[in-house]
Structures are given as structure tokens and as C-alpha cells.
Amino acid sequence: AKRADIVVFLTGTNYEKPADHHTGTESHDRWIISLPGNQEDMLKALYEANNNTVLVLETGSSMDISWAKENVPAILEAWYGGQAQGQAICDAIYGDINPSGKLTSTWYNSIDELPKGTDSNFDRDGRNGMMEYDIDDWGYTYMYYGKAKHGRQAAKPLYPFGYGLSYTTFEYSNLTAPANITKDDIINITATIKNTGTRDGAEVVQ
């Protein structure tokens, strides 16, 4: 690693092994959101040997990669990309394509920031212990995450819902939206998006 120009470290979770408690599937919830095994230790060792390290994540959901965010210069989330994933990753790293994806979930700093399913505070309507999951009032998920609610301290996510970088930059202008709407209205929102960088790219408007 010390002699390499760039170190590319591919890591993540194994969708075939949900029993490791790091991987969520249709029938298994995760207990842990850190990288399985000694993968973070390996990443730290590689980074110590060569600071010019690229972290490529192959995961099915959000992970606690707070150390990597603070230290690793480049992070690419590849998800489970299928048989052409290798070529797509290489194209993105070499700059042959410009990534434009955005996160579809909030990424947290640690497991401690997630609510417990057994938390009695969720039983807000007294229906025999059934969980009443109100994302607005309790402030646990994506756009509501970060509010101080019910004794819970305000927090800042590791990466917010909709986060994503590009090799270029975009400028938003001329935003128009209706001032008044009623139930069942069709809402038309328009904006002008300008690529202000030097590379071709696509933008997800949000």
C-alpha cells in the first residue's frame, strides 16, 4: 500500500449473512450499523500506510462510517450493483463517468442515535404496547432528524437524506411554486438548473 499511487479499499456487508447483525434483510433487522469484522481496522491500517485512499462501500443500507468521513479523502457508495458493478466503480473512480446519485436514507453517526423498538415512549396511544412511530413529532428520520424532541438532544446526521456529491457543481435559480394549495391540487414547481463546473453531469433536483 505504501508504494501504490492510490489505494482502493472495497468493503461492506454480506447480504447472504444477515445473522452477523450488521446486515438488514427482509426478515432480519440489524443490531449494529458499523462495518462487520475488522474492516474498519483494515481501512485505518491502509490509510496510515497511504493517505491517498479511496473507500468503496458495497452495502444495502446506511452505515456508521464516521471515522472514514473525517479521514478518508474519497468515499463511493456502490450498494449492491449487480454484475456490471466492477466496471461502474472503475469508471467513477477514473472519472470516465460523473456520479450523480443521492442517498435514499439518513446515515447516522452511531447506533445510539437510533430509537429502540422497545422504547415505551413510542407507545403513545396505549394500544396494548403497539409502537406509534411518528417521524414528525419524534424527529427520528430524514427531514425531521435533528430536532430536540421529548428530552432527546438535537443531533446532526453523518449524511442527510438526499446527500450526494459530483465532479461538477450546479446552481439553482428562478424557483417558482404556488403560494396557495388545497387538498388534491396538482402542484407544479419549476427551477432553472445550471452546470457551473467544468465537467458534464446530471443533477437530482430536490
Q: What residues fall within each predicted segment?
A:
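Hydrophobic helix-and-loop "lid/oligomerization" segment in the mid-to-C-terminal part
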Residues: 1-70
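Secreted, periplasmic, or luminal enzymes acting at the cell surface/secretory milieu
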Residues: 58-202
